[in-house]
Design a protein with these regions (language model features):
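Hydrophobic transmembrane alpha-helices
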Residues: 2-56, 60-68
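Lipid-exposed faces of alpha-helical membrane segments in multi-pass integral membrane proteins
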Residues: 21, 25, 29-32, 67, ...
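Interfacial aromatic-anchored transmembrane helix boundaries in multi-pass membrane proteins
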Residues: 31-44, 67-102
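Structural signal for the C-terminal ends of transmembrane alpha-helices
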Residues: 55-58, 95-104, 170-178
Length: 184
């Protein structure tokens, strides 16, 4: 192996390590912002972050997503509610992955907040699944559980819509930073 090949491999390893550390920091950032914003029930930046990271890092955006989910479990305790986080947040990642990568900006400015709001609106129903299984709810009881939390889901949707307006500008900034840093 030549010296140039060794240097090239070393640079590639450094780049991958930097990217992994950066994605880990993003997961911690998600968790920290959720704690700071906890005074506002169901209003947070998590959906926005997941969408921005997915647009910029594609499948690697699952790293900060699951770091966030794991930190939530450690901080608040691993309970029935936490099980839903294992699929509810990655669902937003999956929906974002399915969106066209090259949407016109005007379309993206409308689509991203709507997707974020929709995810916030259905979040309670997604969380009802493990609750219904764990507590042996009937279908009617599950619907009642969802209905009881609907006001929180509407709040979640409104917050997600507002923060969803930042998805496109922040993803453009992140792409520019990635391009200029040459480390990611």
């Amino acid at each position: 192996m030549t010296e140039n090949e060794r240097r090239s491999r070393a640079r590639e390893r450094s780049r991958k390590l930097f990217e992994l550390v950066l994605l880990t920091v993003f997961g911690v950032l998600m968790f920290a912002t959720k704690i700071v914003m906890a005074v506002l029930p169901n209003v947070h930046l998590i959906g926005m972050f997941i969408m921005v990271f997915t647009i910029s890092f594609r499948s690697k955006a699952l790293i900060p997503t699951y770091i966030y989910v794991i930190l939530e479990g450690f901080y608040f305790g691993f309970n029935v509610w936490w099980v839903a986080y294992l699929y509810a947040w990655p669902l937003l990642w999956a929906i974002t992955m399915l969106l066209p990568r090259r949407m016109p900006r005007k379309v993206a400015m409308a689509v991203y907040p709507v997707v974020a709001a929709f995810h916030g609106l259905i979040f309670g129903a997604l969380c009802a699944i493990p609750q219904a299984i764990a507590y042996n709810f009937s279908f009617e009881e599950t619907l009642a559980w969802i209905a009881a939390g609907l006001s929180f889901d509407v709040t979640h949707a409104v917050g997600n819509f507002c923060f969803g307006l930042l998805v496109l500008p922040l993803s453009l900034v992140l792409e520019k930073l990635k391009k200029n840093s040459r480390l990611v």
